Amino acid sequence: MNIVDQQTFRDAMSCMGAAVNIITTDGPAGRAGFTASAVCSVTDTPPTLLVCLNRGASVWPVFNENRTLCVNTLSAGQEPLSNLFGGKTPMEHRFAAARWQTGVTGCPQLEKALVSFDCRISQVVSVGTHDILFCAIEAIHRHATPYGLVWFDRSYHALMRPAC
């Protein structure tokens, strides 16, 4: 039996490129946000995506109580914002670093994100240290920027949308 240790798993996962997202919420438990690359599509009928959130994260209780979130997929050039939301910076300073609109769920939408998915959490499944949040998409807001941002091999990389 081959047992995969934590470092081997993390090293292997660094080979999988992923979009960089800031996940936000606002509601009775307050306003919070964090950076995540563990986000993916589940189904288009009904439109659903998933977000993985460590139950030990300081933001977990806020998302758990609010039950709404917005997945803001970042554009190239927004790396400093990703770093800010990925650290221990106080929430008010994180949100003060960018311009936001309010989505239909009441969650903050980043004005210059590549795309924003405004969602209600429809189901939560716990696996190991994380909760997998299944998110029913209520609204999508796409932005005109031609540059995406991915996390690959432990660093940021810009992607350019092909010219039509």
From Swiss-Prot:
Keywords for the protein's UniProt record, in alphabetical order: Flavoprotein, FMN, NAD, Oxidoreductase
Expression is induced as follows: Up-regulated by the nitrogen regulatory protein C (NtrC also called GlnG) and repressed by RutR.
Q: Name one GO biological process term.
A: nitrogen utilization
Q: Does the keyword Oxidoreductase apply?
A: yes
Q: What is its EC number?
A: 1.5.1.42
Asked whether the UniProt record includes NAD among its keywords, one would answer yes
Which InterPro entries does the record match to this protein? Flavin_Rdtase-like_dom, NADH-dep_flavin_reductase, RutF, Split_barrel_FMN-bd
At the top level, the lineage of the source is: Bacteria
User: What is its biological role?
Assistant: Catalyzes the reduction of FMN to FMNH2 which is used to reduce pyrimidine by RutA via the Rut pathway.
Q: Which HAMAP family match?
A: RutF (MF_00833)
Q: Which family does it belong to?
A: Belongs to the non-flavoprotein flavin reductase family. RutF subfamily.
| UniProt-recorded name of the protein | FMN reductase (NADH) RutF
List the taxonomic lineage: Bacteria, Pseudomonadati, Pseudomonadota, Gammaproteobacteria, Enterobacterales
Q: Coding gene?
A: rutF
